[in-house]
């Protein structure tokens, strides 16, 4: 999809022949299409912080990402942190704030503690992902999330434990794999990925005869 609201596509051909470029669009420009086109064309260097934070909740992902990258370029850690922890805010702005902080390599144990206890399953999951990518978990909160009631959180926590090389997670990772019962390949993958990253070769060999 282009910023003008059109769908751009080509027809696939099995031969090496060239295909024409086609576009589809509604009969007339809608107000939403015009708005998206105008916002994407704006110079975000001239927009203030509040305007950019508001755009983190826009329905168009390109606009949300553009606002996120603009806030990251300005190093707006404080504004992003406040929004990410605000439980009254909508989910998308909070997620983009967290992702922006990840881009800035922001690390803070209190911040991680707040997000790990959030009511939103997806925010907890993304907090685990954030911790894993930054290799940051000074209080060993991520292994605990392997027993989170949300499978989505368990998935992200399992992968993160591997990146963190968390020895405290070995038992919980084993439980995660066993609980998957070869019926949930996604959770099994998370558990195996976690073990491969966190366990030594000798520790992995100890699982060979696991029932």
Where are these regions (language model features)?
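Extracellular/periplasmic ectodomains of large secreted or surface enzymes and adhesion receptors
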Residues: 1-211
């Amino acid at each position: 999809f282009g910023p003008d609201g059109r769908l751009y596509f080509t027809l696939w051909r099995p031969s090496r022949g060239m295909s024409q470029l086609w576009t589809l669009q509604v009969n007339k420009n809608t107000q939403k299409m015009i708005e998206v086109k105008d916002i994407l064309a704006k110079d975000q260097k001239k927009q203030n912080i509040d305007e950019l934070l508001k755009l983190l909740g826009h329905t168009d992902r390109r606009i949300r990402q553009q606002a996120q990258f603009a806030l990251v370029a300005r190093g707006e850690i404080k504004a992003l942190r406040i929004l990410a922890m605000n439980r009254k805010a909508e989910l998308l702005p909070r997620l983009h704030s967290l992702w922006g902080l990840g881009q800035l390599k922001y690390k803070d144990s209190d911040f991680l503690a707040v997000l790990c206890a959030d009511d939103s399953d997806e925010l907890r999951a993304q907090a685990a992902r954030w911790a894993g990518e930054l290799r940051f978990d000074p209080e060993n909160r991520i292994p605990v999330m392997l027993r989170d009631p949300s499978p989505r959180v368990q998935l992200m926590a399992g992968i993160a434990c591997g990146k963190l090389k968390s020895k405290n997670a070995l038992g919980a990772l084993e439980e995660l794999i066993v609980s998957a019962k070869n019926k949930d390949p996604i959770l099994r993958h998370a558990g195996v990925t976690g073990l491969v990253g966190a366990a030594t070769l000798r520790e992995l060999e100890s699982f060979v005869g696991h029932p």
